[in-house]
């Protein structure tokens, strides 16, 4: 089982997430017999520090989370406006997703791996399509509570997926201003993908979800244009509607 561990802190509580490849709790987890594979899911654990409580949430189905067949991981969790926001990051097609209905979700057959390879968090299996086929869009999932049921999914084509990347780390780039407006930043990490069809042509930028809204508004800022062509690794909310960005120093 290959796992990616995610962690988000909330005052005296902690949420941890595990992206797993064999989640029996996931509905319809078993793949077609010929693949001998299972669907990916995200297991959420709630830890309360002072009360010393640990609760395991139901496994969230990771496959086809966005309706394009790809599985996702979550880059950060944000509490704002009595909701929970997260940025689902498409990771490509698992062996299960690639084989589903004779390759229904495969846009680029040449990207499907013909043998096992890679190492550590970049390892892959034969039959897998590694990394997303949709680099020119970003998604946000909005949940009503910590049970992580029935999310509202919203999409924008103004930025690429919303997370910073450093090896196996997926950094949160979705933050709320003091007035509840949620700003979604993208460093356009997909620019460095090897395959041209997996590279984004969108610059690093930021979009916004107004407080209480369930869709993006018209706000957009081209961060690369303002920085002379540079992108960033991470970002944080500071105060009001001010944010701190850890910029790259070269193009």
Please give the residue ranges for each predicted region.
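C-terminal motif of bacterial Sec signal peptides marking the signal peptidase cleavage site
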Residues: 17-22
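Acidic/polar, low-complexity intrinsically disordered N-terminal segments immediately downstream
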Residues: 25-93, 145
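Repeated scaffold domains used in trafficking and secretory/extracellular systems
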Residues: 29, 36, 67-79, 163-174, ...
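Beta-propeller blade signature
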Residues: 48-55, 101-149, 198-214, 251
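Beta-propeller fold detector
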Residues: 50-69, 116-118, 124, 150-160, ...
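Short coil/turn segments that connect the beta-strands within blades of beta-propeller domains
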Residues: 81-82, 179-181, 240-242
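Loop-centered beta-sheet repeat module
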Residues: 134-209
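Long, well-ordered mid-to-C-terminal structural blocks that present hydrophobic/aromatic surfaces
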Residues: 184-251
């Amino acid at each position: 089982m290959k796992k990616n561990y995610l962690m988000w802190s909330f005052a005296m509580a902690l949420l941890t997430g595990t992206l797993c490849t064999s989640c029996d709790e996931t509905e319809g987890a078993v793949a077609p017999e010929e693949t001998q594979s299972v669907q990916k899911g995200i297991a959420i654990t709630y830890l309360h520090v002072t009360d010393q409580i640990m609760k395991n949430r139901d496994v969230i189905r990771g496959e086809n989370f966005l309706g394009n067949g790809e599985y996702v991981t979550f880059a950060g969790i944000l509490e704002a406006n009595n909701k929970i926001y997260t940025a689902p990051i498409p990771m490509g097609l698992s062996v299960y997703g690639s084989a589903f209905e004779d390759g229904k979700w495969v846009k680029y057959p040449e990207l499907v791996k013909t043998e096992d390879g890679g190492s550590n968090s970049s390892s892959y299996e034969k039959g897998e399509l590694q990394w997303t086929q949709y680099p020119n869009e970003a998604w946000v999932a909005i949940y009503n509570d910590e049970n992580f049921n029935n999310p509202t999914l919203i999409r924008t084509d103004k930025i690429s997926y919303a997370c910073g990347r450093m090896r196996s780390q997926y950094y949160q780039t979705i933050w709320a201003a003091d007035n509840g407006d949620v700003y979604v930043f993208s460093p356009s990490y997909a620019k460095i993908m090897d395959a041209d069809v997996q590279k984004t042509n969108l610059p690093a930028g930021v979009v916004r979800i107004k407080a209480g809204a369930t869709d993006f508004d018209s706000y957009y800022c081209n961060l690369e244009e303002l920085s002379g062509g540079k992108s960033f690794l991470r970002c944080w909310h500071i105060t009001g509607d001010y944010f701190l960005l850890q910029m790259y120093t070269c193009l």
